[in-house]
């Protein structure tokens, strides 16, 4: 699911990566909010706060909020920058490096977060926004913009459009394609919710260390992909 791109990518691959990453995003969203009371998987709310602070001419606070937006953007930029570099050198590592980077960030905050909450909570928010920017950019690139996992606004918009199209498109081939797309979006929404609920439950017991669980899920996803590809290559040789 991490290794296929373009014409070799199937709906099954998109479903696999959407399930994995949307669960992690939901978990990060809740853990980030519980720990530092900040939204860490999207920037829509932060932009509203930025405009509000700028309108009140509290430019220091406006700059502070703008940093949240910047770190999400920076994560998206760095993620695709890595993808472009490795696509020209080692294609087999195109998506591995950004995913490992995200896993390391989540693990790092999971380990140091208890200390940072009291000393520098903004560093937690910046790091998680950066990681989620990386994830959203990565999954958008992998799936050719079919899948986005870190926020739900676009998902509900696309799903609303597709539901309305069901009433007008009578062609069975097109209708089948719409239904598959709607199912994919419903799964992403459900697993984002499941990740959030899991994050909330684990947070009551483990606090910000819950992010270690998110990091582990990403690494297990990479391991599964690696083992599956090796098995397929081995079968071809036999």
Which ranges hold each PLM region?
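Alpha-helical transmembrane segments of multi-pass membrane proteins
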Residues: 2-238
């Amino acid at each position: 699911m991490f290794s296929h791109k373009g014409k070799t990518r199937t709906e099954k691959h998109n479903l696999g990566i959407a399930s994995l990453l949307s669960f992690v995003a939901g978990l990060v969203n809740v853990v980030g909010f519980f720990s530092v009371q900040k939204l860490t998987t999207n920037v829509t709310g932060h932009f509203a706060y930025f405009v509000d602070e700028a309108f009140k001419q509290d430019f220091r606070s406006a700059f502070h909020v703008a940093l949240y937006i910047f770190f999400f953007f920076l994560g998206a930029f760095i993620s695709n920058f890595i993808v472009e570099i490795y696509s020209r050198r080692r294609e087999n590592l195109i998506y591995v490096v950004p995913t490992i980077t995200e896993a390391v960030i989540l693990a790092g905050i999971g380990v140091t977060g208890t200390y940072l909450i009291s000393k520098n909570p903004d560093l937690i928010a910046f790091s998680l926004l950066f990681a989620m920017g990386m994830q959203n950019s990565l999954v958008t690139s992998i799936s050719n913009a079919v899948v986005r996992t870190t926020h739900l606004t676009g998902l509900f918009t696309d799903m609303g459009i597709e539901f309305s199209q069901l009433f007008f498109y009578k062609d069975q081939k097109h209708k089948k394609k719409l239904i598959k797309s709607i199912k994919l979006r419903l799964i992403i929404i459900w697993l984002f919710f499941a990740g959030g609920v899991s994050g909330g439950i684990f947070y009551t017991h483990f606090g910000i260390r819950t992010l270690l669980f998110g990091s582990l899920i990403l690494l297990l996803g990479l391991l599964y992909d690696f083992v599956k590809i090796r098995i397929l290559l081995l079968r071809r040789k036999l």
